[in-house]
């Protein structure tokens, strides 16, 4: 028999979402400001309602059952719509509005000062939380923990980071496309040699750990050529790789998007840029579409629409 929503305490759905996020009765109870016993009783009611265990105990915490996994996206959408409904008055008199972004650094460093000024000008009492883009950022957008992401994707046909492979629930807008360039300090010995593929591969490289991988499309293109670079140092992001490339007493070189010239000028890093020594077809595979990403449930959220427009305008002005 079909069950009526009027017979369900909607607070139980909040408890269910927090259990899915935390995978722990104790942690969920802490976030709800109730006792673990109260959460356990709520879970018992949910199990009876859905006629399913929902979670099973494991040494690593609560593990969701297949039914719970199948409901995760719908539950997140339900909660997001509820938050938007309760936030309606704030769109008229915004107080305490929160902006949560996940962005690639140094891209955010270039525009954050201007973006934050625009946010505070429009929403004086807003709070802003920025996290570095990482392997979990897409899931964070899906879970409703991040309003909008801003990062580069890849164009190589074998890449796992193609725009066409984004989850169906994620919407996006490409703001600009860029090519990676090679960055060397001003007195690097490679600058005294002919700039070709052999010179590029002769020196040790700084790579970044991107989406839990130390290699990316550049390495795929080199593999197609039967070549390989020596990755001597792996760092979390472009910001750190540029900083290290600028340091004296080593011959490391970095590869980062060309837009990083704005970051280098801002911080006066003594770096020189050189194009990758590849032909046009190979460079095409390395094109990076820098993209805004958000959940489709937020496509008409006034806060997100305004934020997208603000970032778009700043990109055209600063990048």
UniProtKB/Swiss-Prot annotation:
Q: Which InterPro entries match?
A: LysR-type_TF (IPR050389), LysR_subst-bd (IPR005119), Tscrpt_reg_HTH_LysR (IPR000847), Tscrpt_reg_YidZ (IPR023746), WH-like_DNA-bd_sf (IPR036388), WH_DNA-bd_sf (IPR036390), YidZ_PBP2 (IPR037402)
Cytoplasm as UniProt keyword:
no
The source's superkingdom equals Bacteria
Q: Ranges for the HTH lysR-type domain?
A: 8-65
| A Pfam family reported for this protein in Swiss-Prot or TrEMBL | HTH_1
Query: What UniProt keywords are attached to this protein's entry?
Result: DNA-binding, Transcription, Transcription regulation
Q: Name one GO molecular function term.
A: DNA-binding transcription factor activity
Locate the DNA-binding region by residue range.
25-44
The UniProt similarity line reads: Belongs to the LysR transcriptional regulatory family.
Q: Which NCBIfam families match?
A: PRK10216.1
Q: What does this protein do?
A: Involved in anaerobic NO protection.
Instruction: Report what the protein is called.
Output: HTH-type transcriptional regulator YidZ
Source organism per entry reads Salmonella newport (strain SL254)
Species lineage, top-down? Bacteria, Pseudomonadati, Pseudomonadota, Gammaproteobacteria, Enterobacterales
């Amino acid at each position: 028999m079909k069950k009526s929503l009027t017979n369900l305490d909607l607070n139980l759905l909040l408890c269910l979402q927090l259990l899915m996020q935390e995978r722990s009765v104790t942690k969920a109870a802490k976030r709800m400001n109730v006792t673990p016993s109260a959460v356990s009783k709520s879970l018992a009611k949910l199990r009876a309602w859905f006629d399913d265990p929902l979670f099973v105990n494991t040494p690593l915490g609560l593990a969701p059952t297949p039914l719970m996994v199948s409901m995760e996206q719908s539950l997140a959408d339900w909660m997001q719509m509820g938050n938007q409904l309760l936030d309606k008055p704030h769109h008229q008199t915004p107080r305490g509005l929160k902006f949560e972004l996940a962005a690639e650094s140094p891209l955010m460093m270039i525009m954050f000062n201007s973006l934050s000024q625009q946010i505070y000008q429009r929403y004086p009492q807003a709070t802003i939380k920025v996290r570095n883009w990482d392997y979990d950022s897409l899931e964070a957008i899906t879970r409703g923990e991040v309003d909008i992401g801003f990062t580069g994707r890849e164009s190589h046909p074998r890449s796992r980071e193609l725009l066409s492979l984004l989850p169906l629930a994620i919407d996006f807008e490409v703001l600009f496309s860029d090519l990676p360039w090679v960055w060397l300090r001003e007195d690097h010995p490679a600058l005294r040699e002919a700039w070709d593929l052999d010179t590029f591969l002769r020196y040790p490289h700084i790579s970044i750990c991107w989406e839990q991988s130390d290699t990316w499309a550049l390495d795929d293109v080199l593999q197609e050529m039967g070549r390989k670079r020596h990755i001597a140092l792996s760092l979390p992001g472009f910001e750190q790789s540029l900083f290290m490339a600028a340091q004296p007493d080593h011959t490391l070189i970095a590869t980062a998007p060309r837009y990083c010239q704005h970051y280098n000028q801002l911080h006066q890093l003594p770096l020189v840029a050189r194009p990758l020594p590849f032909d046009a077809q190979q460079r095409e595979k390395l094109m990076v579409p820098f993209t805004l990403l958000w959940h489709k449930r937020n496509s008409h959220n006034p806060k997100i629409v305004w934020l997208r427009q603000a970032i778009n305008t700043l990109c055209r002005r600063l990048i």
